C-alpha cells in the first residue's frame, strides 16, 4: 500500500503566519490537494484535529483520521509526531508526507522512473542555500540545537536548503528517518522560542545521517512559490 499523507490542524497557532489559528472546514484549504489525489486515484490520508463529520462526508475517496490537538508542541513540530504515529500504526510500502493547502500532486510519485527504495525524496527552495534563510537561521537561538555536533556549521553553510513540505520514500528508508527526526524534535524543541525547529533539524539530519541517500528538487517538486502549472514534476508546491 502506498500513501500520500497530510494534516489539517486548527487547535494550535501557526507560528509561520503570525500565530493565527486556521479555520476548520475550509474547503479552499484542502481543495487543490484533494482534487489532485482523486484525479490520480491515490490513497490520500488527512490527519485532523477538529473537522466536522459534515465536512468530511462531502470529501469521499480519501481517509480522514482524528488526532489530538498539538497541546504543548509547536504546530509544525507536532506534525512530525503525527507522521511518526501514522507509520507505526499502518502498514505501507511507500509514503509521501506533504503540506496541504499549497501542494498539488501532479504525478503518482511511486511509479516514476527516478523513484527507488533506497532514496529519501524531498523538495528544495529553488536552489537556495541554508545560509541566510529566516527559519533556518532562527534555530541559532535554540541553545539545545546549537549543542549538536556540527549543527551551526551545517545550517549556516552554502549547502542546498531542503524543503520538508514534500518528503517521501519507501518503508525501508523513511521509517527510520521519521523516527529519528521525531525523536530529535522532541528532544530539541523549545516552546519559549517563537519559531519551529523542524526545518533546521530536517536539514541537519539529512546532511549528517543521510547525505548519500537523498534527492531534492525537480522532478520531485516545482519551483517553490512560483505557482507553476506544469506536468513534468511529481508535486507543485505553491
Where are these regions (language model features)?
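Short catalytic/ligand-binding loop motif for oxyanion handling, primarily in non-cytosolic enzymes
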Residues: 12-15, 53-56, 103-107, 112-114, ...
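Short amphipathic alpha-helical face segments that pack within enzyme cores
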Residues: 32, 82, 104, 200-201
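Catalytic core and acceptor-binding pocket of nucleotide-sugar-dependent glycosyltransferases
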Residues: 150-238
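PAPS-dependent sulfotransferase catalytic domain
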Residues: 118-167, 199
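N-terminal anchoring/stem segment of glycosyltransferases
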Residues: 1-93, 172
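Viral RNA-dependent RNA polymerase
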Residues: 34, 57-59, 66-68, 92-100, ...
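A structural signal for short, well-ordered beta-strand segments and their strand-loop junctions
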Residues: 4-5, 45-48, 95-99, 105, ...
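GT-A fold catalytic core of metal-dependent nucleotide-sugar glycosyltransferases
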Residues: 80-136
Amino acid at each position: 500500500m502506498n500513501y500520500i499523507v497530510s494534516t489539517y490542524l486548527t487547535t494550535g497557532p501557526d507560528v509561520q503566519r503570525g500565530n493565527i489559528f486556521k479555520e476548520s472546514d475550509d474547503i479552499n484549504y484542502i481543495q487543490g490537494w484533494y482534487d489532485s489525489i482523486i484525479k490520480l486515484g491515490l490513497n490520500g490520508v488527512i490527519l485532523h484535529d477538529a473537522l466536522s463529520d459534515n465536512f468530511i462526508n462531502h470529501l469521499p475517496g480519501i481517509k480522514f483520521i482524528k488526532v489530538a490537538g498539538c497541546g504543548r508542541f509547536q504546530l509544525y513540530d507536532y506534525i512530525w509526531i503525527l507522521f511518526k504515529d501514522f507509520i507505526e500504526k499502518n502498514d505501507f510500502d511507500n509514503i509521501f508526507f506533504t503540506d496541504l493547502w499549497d501542494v498539488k500532486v501532479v504525478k503518482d510519485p511511486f511509479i516514476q522512473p527516478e523513484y527507488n527504495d533506497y532514496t529519501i525524496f524531498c523538495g528544495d527552495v529553488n536552489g537556495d542555500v541554508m545560509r541566510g534563510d529566516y527559519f533556518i537561521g532562527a534555530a541559532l537561538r535554540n541553545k539545545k540545537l546549537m549543542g549538536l555536533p556540527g549543527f551551526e556549521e551545517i545550517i549556516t553553510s552554502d549547502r542546498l536548503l531542503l524543503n520538508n513540505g514534500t518528503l517521501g520514500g519507501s518503508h525501508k528508508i523513511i521509517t527510520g528517518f521519521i523516527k529519528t527526526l521525531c525523536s530529535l524534535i522532541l528532544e530539541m524543541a523549545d516552546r519559549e522560542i517563537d519559531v519551529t525547529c523542524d526545518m533546521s533539524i530536517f536539514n541537519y539530519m539529512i546532511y549528517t545521517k543521510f547525505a548519500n541517500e537523498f534527492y531534492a528538487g525537480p522532478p520531485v517538486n516545482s519551483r517553490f512559490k512560483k505557482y507553476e502549472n506544469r506536468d513534468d514534476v511529481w508535486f507543485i508546491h505553491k
